[in-house]
């Protein structure tokens, strides 16, 4: 398992004296592997924080995730396949917050994913070339939020990640 906790204080010198500080206390992050065998792994993670900024703007979040991913399954034709099931429970409340209400908001999100790839090798007289075409099918039966106005970038490094936009809520 892995457990991290603490508190953080930020100072923004651009703000007026009353709104200059942001307090994050406490915050925690706990993760553990619940099951790991020859078929795959089941992982649990919970993280939360209380954030106070602009004198009276309070936001409290608790996020729980439960992920199951299979080990790679090799077919006779050379395909490497795996699938994953991802559940996320988001609990948020805010006080004087523009994004969240003062009552507890709770969401259950999930994604089902199937990945497949086919490693290919080409031998020449002096070189060996490798290429691996990949495809990922995802189903999200939950409501999806619109992040098109956010400044997020999808690159070749994160295109196959489950959280490729790097969004925490």
Regions found by a protein language model. Give the residues of each.
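Outer-membrane beta-barrel proteins and related beta-barrel translocases across Gram-negative bacteria
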Residues: 1-169
């Amino acid at each position: 398992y892995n457990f991290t906790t603490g508190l953080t204080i930020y100072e923004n010198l651009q703000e007026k004296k009353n709104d200059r500080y942001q307090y994050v206390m406490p915050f925690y992050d706990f993760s553990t592997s619940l099951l790991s065998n020859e078929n795959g792994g089941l992982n649990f993670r919970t993280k939360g924080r209380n954030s106070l900024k602009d004198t009276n703007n309070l936001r409290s979040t608790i996020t729980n995730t439960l992920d199951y991913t299979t080990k790679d399954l090799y077919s006779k034709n050379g395909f490497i396949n795996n699938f994953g099931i991802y559940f996320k429970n988001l609990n948020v409340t805010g006080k004087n917050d523009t994004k969240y209400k003062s009552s507890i908001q709770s969401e259950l999100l999930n994604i089902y994913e199937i990945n497949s790839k086919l490693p290919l090798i080409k031998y020449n007289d002096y070189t060996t070339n490798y290429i691996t075409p990949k495809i990922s099918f995802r189903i999200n039966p939950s409501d999806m939020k619109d992040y098109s106005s956010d400044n997020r970038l999808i690159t070749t490094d994160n295109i196959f990640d489950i959280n490729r936009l790097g969004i925490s809520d």
